[in-house]
Amino acid sequence: MKPHTDEPLTGGSRAKTRKGSLSRKGVRRCGIVAVALSAAVLLSSCMPQGAVTEKRADQLSVGDAVIAVRLSEGKFSAGLPDPPEDNWIVLLDAQGRGQATRIEAKRYGISTLLWTERGLSFGVPDKEYVTTDQGTQEIDVKQPSISEYQRFLLPDGRIAVVALGEGIRVDTIHPHGRIETTEIPDTRGEIGQCGQHIVGITDTEDSESIRSAAFEAYAAQSGGDMPENVAAVIQIDEPNGDVPRLLAVAPAIDGLLTGRMSVPCDGNVITVLSIQQEDPAAVRNGTRQPFDGVLVLQRWDLTTGQRTIIPVLDEAGQPIETDQDNFLYYSRAIRVGDEYRFVTKKGNAYAVDVTSGNARHLFSIPSEKTRNPAVFQVSETGVYVLEQNDDEDVLTLSYQPWDGGGKRVLLTTGTMSRYLVERNLLMGYRRSIESFALRPGWDGGAQ
C-alpha cells in the first residue's frame, strides 16, 4: 500500500449567482405541436441556449438543479481536426436552465457523478469537487489519476473513488476535504460496496498480489487437493500492506465472468449476476466470443466463506443465454426485497430471485434510434433513462416503474445542444452522455 493524505483547501469556494439575460437573438425558432402531457412532463426544448450559464468548476452551486450530466469527449469526425479532449458538467433545473463547466477528461474508464445529501461529487485527474447549495469545494489530488471506475458513498459520509489499471486505487474523500489514497499493485477484479467497505471478486491468475495468501487460506479451509486457480473476495479499502484482505476463497471456475458489482451486499452475503461461458477453451483460442454463455448468480457468504453458483432460469425454466449484444457489464442493478432487479445497456429489464435464480422479464424500454446509447439509473421503484436525440440535439429524461405502467417523460430539453454538437468550418464533433445523477429526493413526479 502507498498511503498518503491530501490536506483540504481552506474553506470551499462560494459560488456567485449570475443570471444570464435572455435576448430574442438567443431564442431558437422551433415548431412544436402541443400535445396533452401529464403534469410531470417538463418541456423546455425550445428554450434559448442562454438558459445555461458557463462558469468555472469552483464557481458552481447546486441551486435549483435536479439533474447533473457529464458529457464525454467529442467523437472524431472524418476529415476534420481531432475534437477537444475534455468533458462538460451541466447542472439543470426542472425547466432546463442551469450551469455548465468545462473540465479535463479522465482518459480511461467511465467518469461518474455521485449526488448525495452531502452534495454532487465529481473529479478530474488532479482535483476532486463537491458542489453544494453554498458553492463548490475544490480539493487537490497530489497523485493524479487518469482513470475512474466507480464512486461509492460510505455510511459515515466519506466518498470512495475507485480507479482500475495495473492495480486498484481508492481515493477516499473525507467530509472535511481530506483525501486518503490507497494503491494495491498487481490486483484486478470487479469492485463493489459491502456496507462500510469496498470489496472485489478476483482470482489468483488476475491478481498476483493475493496468490500466496489465497492458496494458504484455501488449504486451511479445505484440507483437500489444491486447485490451479483460487477465486477470492477481497477487501481493498483497508489492505494489509500491499495485499488486500481476504474475506472468502473458493476454487476458481473456468469461464465464470463476474458481472459488475452494482448491488450492495445483504448483510454478509454478496450476490453478483455473472456469465458462465459456454466453451471457455474456444474463447481462449479465439473461436468463440467471451460473452457467449448463460446467466448465473454468484453468491458468497462471508460468514462461512462459501460460494454458491445458482443458474438463472426464465419463466419457461430455460437458461438465459448471453452474447456480445446482450451481456451485463453495463447493466444497472438494485436489490428490491428478495429480487435482484437490473436493466441491460439495451434497456431490457429483469428481476431475479436471489435464492432460486428464477427470472422474470419485466419490460423493454422503447428507445430513440440514436448513435449514442441511452444511459440508465435505477431506484427501488423503477428505471430512469437519459437519451440523446441525434436529429434535434435534445436530451430526454424518462422513467419506467419496475411494476409496469409505461414509460413516462419527465424532462425534455434542448438547452444543452451547443455542448452536445459542434459544427463549423474548422471542426465538427458530437459528445455523448458519460453519466448522470439525480438530486436526492427528486423524482420529477415519477412516483
Place the predicted regions along the sequence by residue.
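N-terminal "mature head" segments of proteins
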Residues: 2-3, 31-170, 428-447
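Cleavable N-terminal export/targeting peptides
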Residues: 3-6, 10-11
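N-terminal export and membrane-targeting signals
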Residues: 16-37
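Surface-exposed loop/turn elements that mediate protein-protein interactions on large endomembrane-trafficking
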Residues: 48, 79-108, 124-146, 163-186, ...
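Repeated scaffold domains used in trafficking and secretory/extracellular systems
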Residues: 53-58, 104-117, 144-156, 184-196, ...
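Short beta-strand elements that form the blades of beta-propeller/WD-repeat-like
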Residues: 59-82, 112-125, 150-164, 190-223, ...
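C-terminal hydrophobic structural anchor segments
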Residues: 372-396
